[in-house]
């Protein structure tokens, strides 16, 4: 039989506290009806559920990862920017449901700011392209003086719609 002995006196390295972050995905009621529920008496003017924020704040998550999991492999971020009422609905390929795209990039970044955590965005490595991923990084982190890979999706678009510098970490799938 194998045994494991934990020696609390022997330090072999440190862990980056970001490994203790959180994760949200468009699965079941995690987003819609979970953290985001427009028109609910439990939500603020942005649609963020206050009871959920109150439960999450004490966790002091260093990062929050989105759109995460299987969902991101079919998610195209440009569907989730611009005026909410003009965003296209799509089939959620991972979970076989309808995705309204009412909770998108700007809502996620604002949610993280409200929660006091660092946003961590996962790019689509399934049905997406490297250019799409680069354009998303430029949209979030660009200053408006960069040359976007897609002229309709760069920082200049975010800034023209009144958005501020978003700044986020990016990871793949």
Located regions from the model:
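Non-catalytic accessory regions flanking glycosidase/transglycosidase catalytic cores in CAZymes
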Residues: 1-173
């Amino acid at each position: 039989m194998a045994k494991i002995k934990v020696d609390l006196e022997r330090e072999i390295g440190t862990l980056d506290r970001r490994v203790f972050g959180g994760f949200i995905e468009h699965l079941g009621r995690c987003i819609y009806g979970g953290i985001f529920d427009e028109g609910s008496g439990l939500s603020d003017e942005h649609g963020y559920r206050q009871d959920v924020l109150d439960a999450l704040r004490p966790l002091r998550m260093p990062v929050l990862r989105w759109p995460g999991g299987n969902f991101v492999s079919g998610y195209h971020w440009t569907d989730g920017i611009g005026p909410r009422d003009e965003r296209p609905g799509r089939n959620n390929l991972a979970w076989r449901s309808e995705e309204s795209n009412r909770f998108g990039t700007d809502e996620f970044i604002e949610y993280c700011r409200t929660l006091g955590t660092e946003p961590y965005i996962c790019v689509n490595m399934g049905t997406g392209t490297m250019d799409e991923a680069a354009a998303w990084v430029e949209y979030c982190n660009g200053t408006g003086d960069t040359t976007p890979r897609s002229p309709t999706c760069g920082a200049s678009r975010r800034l023209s719609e009144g958005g501020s510098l978003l700044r986020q970490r990016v990871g793949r799938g």
